[in-house]
Design a protein with these regions (language model features):
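A structured beta-alpha segment of the ubiquitous adenosine-cofactor-binding alpha/beta core
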Residues: 2, 144-171, 175-192, 230
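Short glycine/serine/threonine-rich phosphate/pyrophosphate-binding segments
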Residues: 103-110, 128, 174-175, 179-185, ...
Length: 301
């Protein structure tokens, strides 16, 4: 984190690149902007083909999804694959993944490679084919023909997921919305329906979690269900995570390079969405709204 002496060294000639997360809490980026330095936030990378080369969040999520499955496999007292032995047949572990973003899809892929049966769910119709492409079964919850409110859809999905969670050995939740609290996917009723000894790994714990019982960086026991809320799984795979981050940064510097110097092109469709501040002013619309409403979670508390 930049503070104190670090900030006093900055001038309008500097460009500061980092994971400021300014839509969640604008104050760190605002403090840097006050020095006149330009600010690029890596968590504001747009979703486009060209931007993938600098998408730090996707790189991190890839590592998180991988490590989450390994952690669960170590914690859960059951083998993942189907085994037919002289001592009898051992059925495969049943895994449910809620959220088919980068971390969720990676978790599905790794769990499948370890031999588990995997089911995946996402509210986005386009994600269903991605789930199936990994060899997982897509969970599809039928809805009414007419228009539903978001609240009605959420309640229907939660009720429809109960049988799947009740049959699962391990549940991963990986639904996140940039800049806001993680949506609640798993309610008290859903946890109560899970079988004794089952495990829930919440990959969105840093923003409150997708499960009502999740505590960041804590292990919570509700009944006979264990709920894990890790927030920094990427550090457990530091070599790979650092390599991917370094490659993202190299690609970003190449985008910024212009005849031997770094130039911020306000017309660039990757750079402009990442630009939080320049010339001492906050220029990102959502960050401006954050500051105007003063509703950053830390401010509101």
């Amino acid at each position: 984190d930049l503070a104190g002496q670090d900030l006093t060294a900055l001038t309008s000639d500097h460009l500061v690149i980092g994971l400021f997360d300014p839509v969640w809490d604008a104050r760190p980026a605002q403090a840097v902007a006050a020095t006149g330095a330009a600010v690029l936030s890596l968590d504001l990378v747009p979703r486009s083909t060209r931007a993938q080369a600098v998408d730090v969040l996707s790189s991190t999520a890839t590592v998180v999804g991988f490590q989450a499955v390994l952690m669960a496999a170590e914690r859960y007292p059951k083998l993942f694959p189907l085994l037919i032995t002289a001592a009898g047949t051992i059925p495969p572990a049943k895994i449910v993944v809620l959220g088919a973003g980068v971390a969720g899809l990676q978790a599905m892929a790794i769990a499948r490679r370890l031999g588990a049966t995997v089911e995946g769910f996402d509210i986005r119709p386009e994600a269903l084919e991605q789930i199936r492409s990994l060899g997982a079964r897509s969970i599809e919850i039928e809805g009414p023909e007419g228009q539903e409110t978001p609240e009605e859809q959420n309640a229907r999905n939660q009720a429809g997921l109960i049988p799947y969670l009740a049959a699962a050995d391990i549940v991963f939740t990986a639904a996140a919305i940039p800049g806001v609290r993680s949506p609640i996917l798993v309610t008290e009723t859903m946890v109560d329906a899970m079988k004794p000894g089952s495990l829930l790994v919440d990959l969105s714990a840093q923003r409150g979690g997708n499960c009502v019982y999740t505590q960041a960086n804590e292990e919570t026991l509700h009944g006979d269900v264990t709920i894990l809320g890790p927030t920094n799984l990427a550090s457990d795979m530091a070599l790979s995570a650092s390599r991917m981050f370094a490659n993202n940064m190299v690609n970003l510097v190449r985008m910024l390079s212009n005849e031997g110097s770094l130039t911020i092109d306000r017309k660039d469709d990757v750079i402009e969405p990442m630009l939080v501040a320049i010339g001492g002013e906050i220029v990102h619309e959502r960050v401006q709204q954050n500051l105007a409403s003063a509703t950053s979670p830390e401010v509101a508390s």
